[in-house]
């Protein structure tokens, strides 16, 4: 048995201890936290226009959950180009292109009359030139720079949450904060994947297999709690609304308290 062993294998197949909803977890979790962040600032994600970068696991399921919550996602991208679809990204078609055919977004554009395909060009700012309310970078590190941030702010963005690991440069992050944009760092907003891996381990330890809905509900609760932990930390230390500082403080305190309790420091 893997339970109780010194090593842990996660993201396994369902037939050997994996968990339902693990595939969707990072993208879904991103939206659950974003939804809560907006709600706590007097806004609702329903009816909002969202731009997403990427077309991999995180992006696809972020788009799917955003649309389930009533938002319209109008962009996605891959390494060769990006899509602007003013009618809203067709998630079923995107999944067919990316998960079944393993093809490029040119195939999405060819099958979707409302979609506009833009080939990637050096120096071009891609999806971040599109007017939106909420921006979700879900592609790669340092993909959203200062010029992108300026374009987004000029176009009226009011919230940015990271789906990828560190996709926003430090300069862009600071620009968002100075201009009153709600900004949540990936260390909090993309935690849904690793959180669901922990839920997978919980199921293994009890020899249980929860339904998709059970895992999804627990994931949402975790992401909502993460947001409130960082929000509370930011307020407590005099930095209300600074979710980067809140995430850093909350994370540090959790580790420090555990180390102190175990006599490590």
What do these predicted ranges mean?
Residues 2-8:
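Short, small-residue-biased leader/transition segments that mark boundaries at the very start
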Residues 5, 18, 22, 26, ...:
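Helical "substrate-binding/catalytic lid" subdomain
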Residues 9-17, 179-180:
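Glycine/charged-rich beta-loop-alpha catalytic/anionic-binding loops adjacent to active sites
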Residues 153-265:
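Adenosine-phosphate binding glycine-rich loop
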């Amino acid at each position: 048995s893997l339970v109780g062993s010194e090593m842990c294998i996660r993201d396994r197949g369902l037939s050997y201890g994996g968990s339902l909803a693990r595939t969707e977890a990072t993208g879904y979790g991103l939206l659950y936290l974003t939804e809560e962040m907006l709600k706590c600032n007097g806004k609702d994600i329903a009816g909002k226009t969202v731009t997403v970068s990427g077309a991999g696991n995180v992006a696809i399921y972020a788009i799917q959950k955003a649309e389930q919550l009533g938002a319209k996602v109008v962009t996605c991208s891959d390494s060769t180009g990006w899509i602007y679809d003013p009618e809203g990204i067709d998630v079923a078609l995107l999944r067919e292109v990316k998960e079944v055919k393993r093809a490029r977004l040119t195939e999405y554009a060819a099958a979707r009359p409302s979609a506009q395909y833009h080939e990637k060009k050096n120096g071009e700012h891609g999806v971040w030139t599109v007017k939106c309310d909420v921006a979700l970078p879900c592609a790669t590190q340092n993909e959203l720079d200062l010029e992108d941030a300026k374009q987004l702010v000029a176009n009226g963005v009011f919230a940015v949450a990271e789906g990828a690991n560190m996709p926003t440069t430090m300069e862009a992050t600071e620009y968002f904060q100075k201009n009153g944009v709600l900004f949540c760092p990936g260390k909090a907003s993309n935690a849904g994947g690793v959180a669901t891996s922990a839920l997978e381990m919980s199921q293994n330890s009890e020899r249980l297999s929860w339904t998709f809905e059970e895992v999804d509900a627990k994931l949402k609760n975790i992401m909502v709690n993460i947001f409130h932990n960082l929000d509370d930390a930011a307020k407590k230390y005099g930095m209300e609304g600074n979710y980067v500082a809140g995430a850093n403080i909350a994370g540090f305190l959790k580790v420090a308290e555990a180390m102190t309790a175990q006599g490590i420091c």
